[in-house]
Amino acid sequence: MMARDTYAYRQVAVESVEWNGRVEIHPVSGQAYATELNVQCSRRMSDTSIYPLGTIFLVSAKLTDRMGGPQYLYVWHGDEIKVMAEQDAEVFLGAYRRVRL
């Protein structure tokens, strides 16, 4: 049996949140990733003049670390920014929960 590839890109729902006085992007609750996990992505996603606080995005991300530092989700900055409607996010998270069972 092969070890699980933790560096593969996976679809993840993330959202803009206020964190320590700044706007940051973190995973939406209900997935395999902690909501405290940082997401490195395009700065445009945290620009509240474009996307209001609480906007949910669907990204292709991989779990990584930088030279043994803390883990974070990496999203290539050149990827298309996909905004999810709240209903679409609920469907995505519901499908994710069913797959995990």
Describe the residue ranges of each PLM region.
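OB-fold/S1-family single-stranded nucleic acid-binding modules
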Residues: 64-96
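Short acidic/glycine-enriched loop/turn segments that link adjacent beta-strands
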Residues: 19-22, 68
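Short glycine-rich, polar/acidic loop-and-turn segments at beta strand-coil junctions
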Residues: 29, 43, 61-65
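Structural detector for short beta-strands of small beta-barrel domains
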Residues: 1-19
